């Protein structure tokens, strides 16, 4: 019951409720919803910076993957949430994990034109030589999308 309540509070961006539920039962930070998302994955999916900060205080598995194999960092790189990307990296999110298609956070950021996040990932040591399941690097994806500024960064 409290698990569903936690996920609903996250969806509604109810910061105080999220903090109260996790304070009462910190192990809920590791639970997953029907889509395989942890509380951190869900908060980052919606771009809820403060909810993500609250959840991080309860030491979640920062690199937990959803049903598609995506981490919270991959999700924010796809969506362009730079503040949360910075927060996750500051909390030691792994930069070079891959999902079911062998895509990395850098590949997501490059593919979707997130120059600020590409810069952040590179500055923090993301491996730009990693290839996805099709054998393509982040540079290849940027070129295919015609995103010249990112292609130059990755060259």
Where in the sequence are the language-model features?
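Intrinsically disordered, low-complexity regulatory segments in ankyrin-centric signaling systems
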Residues: 1-25, 30, 34-37, 46
